[in-house]
Amino acid sequence: MDAENDSPLPKPQWIYRVGIGQDSHRFLSESSAKPCILAGVIFENSPGFQANSDGDIVFHAICNAISSVTHRIILGEVADELFHTRGITDSSVYLSEAIKSLKSNQMISHVAITIEGNRPKFLPKLSAMRQSIASALNIPLGSVGITATSGEGLSDFGCGDGVQCFCVLTVAEYCN
């Protein structure tokens, strides 16, 4: 008996797995030319993040949430290898690798994102961010939820030193 997958309960046609992911990065100096990218969307008038990659904390948090379901570490393993061997810094490539780690009978059915940071101003770009996430994950726009908070100065993120993101996603898995 495989303790991880066997259960005395009847096997349902669909099971649902929930993944959670987090990521955060500190801003570079204001004089940095590196763009600030969140969910694949460029935020003008804000410096980029201290990171080997483009620092897209939203895509990174989604990668980590997928990894919590698939048990394949993308950030820290796959992404590091892509960076060190091929110079790839685009977080959408890392997210594609995370999606490929899902089994053929698994699909992402919903994702919820929450972002904390005093800057940049998220509200004007939340719609574009939702669309970018839906496109990257190949799910309907209605299956993407996103919220943002300034943090009210209560943490380093709320004081404007960086940005933090949490992601919860649901993976539907078809059982034969």
From Swiss-Prot:
EC number: 4.6.1.12
Site description Transition state stabilizer, residues in chain: N52, S150
Highest taxon of source: Bacteria
This protein's record includes keyword Metal-binding: yes
Binding site for 4-CDP-2-C-methyl-D-erythritol 2-phosphate: D23, S24, H25, T149, S150, G151, E152
Example GO molecular function: metal ion binding
Annotated pathway: Isoprenoid biosynthesis; isopentenyl diphosphate biosynthesis via DXP pathway; isopentenyl diphosphate from 1-deoxy-D-xylulose 5-phosphate: step 4/6
PROSITE patterns given in the database record: ISPF
Cofactor annotation remark: Binds 1 divalent metal cation per subunit.
Pfam families xref list: YgbB
Cofactor (UniProt): a divalent metal cation
Record-level GO BP terms: isopentenyl diphosphate biosynthetic process, methylerythritol 4-phosphate pathway; terpenoid biosynthetic process
Binding-site positions, a divalent metal cation: D23, H25, H60
SUPFAM superfamilies from the UniProt entry: IpsF-like
Reactions catalysed according to its record: 4-CDP-2-C-methyl-D-erythritol 2-phosphate = 2-C-methyl-D-erythritol 2,4-cyclic diphosphate + CMP
Record keywords, A-Z: Isoprene biosynthesis, Lyase, Metal-binding
Oligomer and partners: Homotrimer.
Function: Involved in the biosynthesis of isopentenyl diphosphate (IPP) and dimethylallyl diphosphate (DMAPP), two major building blocks of isoprenoid compounds. Catalyzes the conversion of 4-diphosphocytidyl-2-C-methyl-D-erythritol 2-phosphate (CDP-ME2P) to 2-C-methyl-D-erythritol 2,4-cyclodiphosphate (ME-CPP) with a corresponding release of cytidine 5-monophosphate (CMP).
Family: Belongs to the IspF family.
The protein's name in its UniProt record: 2-C-methyl-D-erythritol 2,4-cyclodiphosphate synthase
